[in-house]
């Protein structure tokens, strides 16, 4: 009887060890991560899920020409264009998805990505480390710079960037942007006014309500071409230049796919063409400020 009991106990222990081993193997399998960076685009397409099946949902802030802005078509209907939007369409096409663009204020695009309500954010993002907890960064697809902008009527106030750091001056920047950080860094004594849209900042400068503003260089140059009273006065030092796509942090497969598409589009000149096309459209003779929107008639 004792031998039987001992045999049964030994059997139970063996089975328990096997079960533990099985659990460990299962746990190991569950915790293994796939190497998406080594996959082809076709392989990645099979791995990608999006917030809405069959769609690529992209948040943007369409007040940032030539990155993203509104144009009016022949029927007077507005649509969002720009080289960010051209790249978004390319990504959607390459992945076999329908593109859905959701316009909102700039800081809203970051919040939507952080809450994982969209797949991508494309709003002229710089790879700011403070945003890493809210999104993954793609590789850089466009390298620009930062500028201090004023008007011809205020230009004489500014001999260099340091001269803008004056408590008597009102300096603008977009809410939640790199430019807002640059304003606080370079002009902490000034009255810094953060606004939701770059269009509103430009309108206030033109109306004499603001002495100057920090604006991304390509965007500043686009406005200056269309509004001769604007002056791109100084380059602003910034060591993290370059624009990236913000990717939902739950979607490593999508991040890898976006990087592959960007790499190809940079290599074959596609992005350069997108930038040229967007600059041409945003510099049209019908480019106007209207209701907080940048509108260029096609």
Positions of PLM-derived features:
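Extended ligand-binding regions for polar small-molecule ligands
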Residues: 23, 30-39, 85-94, 152-154, ...
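Short helix-initiation/N-cap motifs at beta->coil->alpha
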Residues: 83-85, 100-111, 156, 193-207, ...
């Amino acid at each position: 009887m004792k031998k039987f009991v001992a045999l049964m106990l030994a059997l139970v222990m063996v089975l328990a060890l096997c079960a533990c081993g099985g659990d460990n193997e299962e746990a190991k399998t569950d915790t293994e991560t796939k190497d998406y960076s080594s996959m082809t685009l076709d392989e990645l397409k099979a791995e990608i899920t999006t917030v809405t099946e069959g769609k690529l949902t992209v948040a943007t802030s369409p007040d940032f020409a030539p990155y993203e802005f509104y144009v009016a078509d022949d029927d007077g209907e507005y649509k969002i264009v720009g080289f960010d939007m051209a790249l978004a369409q390319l990504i959607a096409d390459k992945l076999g998805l329908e593109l859905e663009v959701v316009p909102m204020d700039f800081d809203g695009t970051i919040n939507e990505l952080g809450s994982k309500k969209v797949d991508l954010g494309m709003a002229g993002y710089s790879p700011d480390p403070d945003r890493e907890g809210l999104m993954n960064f793609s590789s850089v697809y466009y390298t620009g710079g930062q500028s201090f902008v004023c008007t011809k009527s205020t230009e004489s106030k500014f001999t260099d960037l340091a001269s803008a750091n004056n408590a008597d001056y009102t300096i603008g920047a977009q809410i939640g942007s790199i430019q807002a950080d640059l304003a606080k860094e370079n002009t902490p004594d000034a009255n810094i006014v953060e606004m939701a849209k770059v269009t509103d900042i430009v309108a206030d400068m033109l109306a004499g309500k603001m002495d100057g503003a920090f604006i991304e260089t390509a965007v500043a140059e686009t406005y200056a071409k269309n509004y001769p009273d604007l002056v791109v006065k100084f380059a602003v030092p910034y060591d993290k230049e370059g624009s990236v796509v913000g990717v939902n942090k739950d979607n490593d497969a999508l991040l890898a796919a976006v990087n592959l598409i960007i790499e190809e589009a940079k290599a074959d000149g596609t992005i350069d063409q997108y930038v040229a096309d967007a600059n041409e459209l945003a510099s049209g003779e019908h480019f106007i400020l209207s209701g907080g929107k940048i509108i260029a008639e096609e």
